[in-house]
Amino acid sequence: LDDRDLYVLVSQYGNEPLLIELAKYCKEKGHTLVAVINKKSYDVAQPLHESGKKLLDFADEYLDMSTEEPDIALHVGKYNVGQLSSTVSNVMAQMITAEVYNLYVSNGKEAPILLSANVKGADVHNNRLTDVYEGRVR
């Protein structure tokens, strides 16, 4: 963890013990924590961590996936399939990434975007970025 890092934790229910441990650790280290949850699911979920806490007990801000509870897209016979929260949270992550890049550009800075290896000159561009972010890119 780097002191400059902001953490985003994604969970439909926000009650899993390992997730709570990670949220607790982030806050103990003084990091800003943003939770991405499905509020309808979160509100009905019982805490599973021994502390009785859930993700929003640690989050500085949260984003709501706004999917239904239960989190299903289709009824196939007796089965419920196609969880929407996975798709919605992925789209939200891409939108957040795009907005961060937009903020870089609108503030006159070069956005640190790694290019596909298929793009001509990507190796030179990407090496410059990995040099700048040495030790932070995995």
PLM feature spans:
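Glycine-rich phosphate-binding loops that contact phosphosugars or nucleotide phosphates
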Residues: L1-A98
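Active-site phosphate/pyrophosphate-binding segments
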Residues: N102-R138
